[in-house]
Amino acid sequence: MNQEEMIRDVRKRLFEMQDTGYRDFHARLIPTVEKEKIIGIRTPILRKFAKEFGKTERSEMFLKVLPHQYYEENNLHGLLIEQIRDYDKCLGELERFLPHIDNWATCDLLALHMMKKHRDIFSREIYRWMESDKSYIIRFGISMLMRHYLDEGFKPEYPEKVAAIRSEEYYVNMMRAWYFATALAKQYEKILPFLEEQRMDIWTHNKTIQKSIESYRITQEQKDHLRTLRIKK
């Protein structure tokens, strides 16, 4: 089977999983993607397919195909990268794939749990991504800090790096707020000074407080204090 035949076959399989109602709903959540490029596949179903497809030789061929035509093809690509257990190979495939991400959902789909075993060296790549000129690469870098470096891997320099980012991009700043809201739930005393000393732009500062107040992981006492830290525009 050549590459063109493989893509046709994969695409046929993807359309067999289509849910048009879900497509119409999901299209409203990812306005940066044209609706015509969304097939409409629920994530658990796509994950199951990716797990099966990842065991075949065709998956290696699929990873060589970039850019993709459909949103779900990009998501499938990301889910296949997640299955790679070799650090260098995984990083290499990420480098090829990240510039093609064009929406927050594909960006946030990638968890890369295997990177927990490589925290000491993976942080260097995260720093580099956060200095990118591409919004979704920056967002991805922040998401990796949030997923893998807020518990035993936490260092004070990490929130400093996120706070220092200056961007006009909504999807970058929303991830920054999400990072700090999650960090407050896990490292409250170490993160609180970023709000008390107003180390971020006003929008991200206030959005962090909003998301924290909405969180069940923040105590009522903490929420009451956070409310006093809102910046009035």
Describe these PLM feature segments.
Residues 1-233:
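Alpha-helical scaffold domains
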